[in-house]
Amino acid sequence: MRLNILKITIFIFNQNSFKLIEKTSKDLSRYYLDLEKKYGAHDYHPLPVVLEKGEGVFMWDVNGKKYYDFLSAYSAVNQGHCHPELVSLIKNQAETLTLTSRAFHNNKLGEYMEFATKLFGFDQLLPMNTGAEGVETSIKLSRKWGYLKKKVDENQAKIVVCNNNFHGRTTTVISFSSDPGSKDFFGPHTPGFIHIPHGEISALENEFKKDKNIV
């Protein structure tokens, strides 16, 4: 059986010149993996698959191998890849107005907020960039409600969290993680969290009985 290995030409740009590098499909993934290993801070350990393009529910790696995308961004983004309508909308907006600071209003944010609040049955919303940012803001909201409405003791607000949670990698979020790999060597951790087993209502009720500062 004869093995055909695809040759791929890559342009590498540095400060002084373009370098022309010839790679085969056999070592192309290794090339990109080694680049990340050499120049990236290793805060994550992804699968050794180097993706290059996507369409609909499918993705292809740099060697042309096809995959079903069952992860999407851990379900945070699930619109599929390169939907022509979305591509057109993104392109049109980028050609019209690319970015505005919250120091200004724009003609899209209010319409988005109206659509989202009516869709989910909320009164108001505060958009966030990431899940961890949303959790951080929820913590602030809960604490402020506790001080202004519930009248908990000053700077003593507590939040009950479940063991084995994962909500991100910011300093406060890892402070209520029970995973040593997420929080070791990052202390001192943010105080004010009470851990209980997931799914045990009696444990939650018991904490509310013991501590009047739970928000």
Residue ranges and their predicted role:
Residues 49-71:
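Active-site and channel-lining beta-strand-loop segments
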Residues 18-55, 103:
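Active-site-adjacent loop/helix segments that line or gate small-molecule/cofactor pockets in enzymes
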Residues 1-24:
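N-terminal mitochondrial targeting presequence
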Residues 114-215:
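PLP-dependent aspartate aminotransferase-fold enzymes
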Residues 66-152:
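Glycine-rich loop-to-alpha-helix module at the N-terminal edge of alpha/beta enzyme cores
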Residues 27, 31, 54, 81, ...:
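Conserved active-site and cofactor/substrate-binding residues in soluble primary-metabolism enzymes
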Residues 60, 79-80, 175-176:
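Short beta-strand-to-turn element immediately C-terminal to the catalytic PLP-Schiff-base lysine
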Residues 58, 78-79, 194-195:
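Short, well-ordered beta-strand elements within core beta-sheets of diverse protein domains
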